[in-house]
Regions:
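Short, conserved structural patches
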Residues: 55-134
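Alpha-helical assembly-interface signal, strongest on the long, hydrophobic N-terminal helix that forms
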Residues: 2-71
Length: 134
């Protein structure tokens, strides 16, 4: 009788240990995967916006409102708020064949339960070539 009771208690302890392992080890991994997926989504959206911005800036040969608007439209299409993203275009004017760089920077907060929390800076840049002669 005591042996049967002891085995039942031991099975209960094993079940509790399994639940704790899942809760404290596998859940942070799951949350980490979800957080990393969100960061990759943001980065891909920024890459797309920088590429479009470099293309439009190269076509126009300068940094102007049309370039900024096109980058904002692309960021919005990716689900990002253009107000929270820094866009730089350098140099402001280019001639035929000269490089023009569009850089998109945003700050994100990464938090994985039970592990860590930190602020990250995501940066994307693309280089286009001037297609007009000023």
């Amino acid at each position: 009788m005591r042996g049967v009771r002891r085995r039942r208690l031991q099975r209960g302890q094993e079940t509790l240990q399994a639940v704790l392992v899942v809760a404290f080890m596998l859940l942070p991994v799951l949350f980490g995967i979800v957080e990393l997926g969100g960061l990759i989504h943001v980065w891909i959206g920024q890459q797309s916006a920088a590429a479009i911005g470099a293309r439009v800036a190269g076509e126009r040969g300068e940094d102007d409102a049309i370039v900024r608007d096109r980058v904002a439209v692309e960021l919005h299409a990716a689900g990002l708020d253009p107000a929270h993203v820094q866009v730089t275009v350098s140099p402001p004017y280019v001639r035929w064949g000269q490089p023009i760089t569009v850089r998109v920077i945003s700050r994100r907060h990464l938090a994985i339960p039970f592990l860590f929390s930190r602020d990250l800076t995501l940066a994307s840049s693309y280089v286009g070539r001037g297609e007009v002669n000023h």
